[in-house]
Swiss-Prot record:
Identification of the protein by name: Neurotoxin LmNaTx11.6
Domain notes: Has the structural arrangement of an alpha-helix connected to antiparallel beta-sheets by disulfide bonds (CS-alpha/beta).
Pfam families: Toxin_3
Single GO MF annotation: sodium channel inhibitor activity
GO cellular component: extracellular region
Signal peptide: 1-18
Keyword set includes Secreted: yes
Expression sites by tissue: Expressed by the venom gland.
Localization of this protein: Secreted
């Protein structure tokens, strides 16, 4: 029973300290990609920001399990390329 309680507490902690979203560069633009070649590139970019994984979705890198400190789209900055 203690193991089940510890498991649920751990799962709640993961939910509190991680988020999902489109990865944003310092200029406010999303990391772009192509679906054919983008998954491995996006996975690497997302993991560089401590995400659990990433993939190319709608021509931008979508990350799962990002720390709360990492900016995601829509960011407060407008995209200035």
């Amino acid at each position: 029973m203690k193991i089940v309680i510890i498991f649920f507490i751990a799962m709640m902690a993961v939910g509190v300290y991680s988020k999902d979203g489109y990865l944003v560069k310092k200029n406010g633009c999303a990391y772009d990609c192509t679906v054919l070649f983008g998954d491995s590139n996006c996975n690497g970019e997302c993991k560089a920001f401590k995400a659990s994984w990433g993939s190319c979705y709608a021509f931008a890198c979508y990350c799962r399990g990002l720390p709360d400190s990492v900016p995601t789209y829509p960011s407060s900055k407008t995209c200035s390329s």
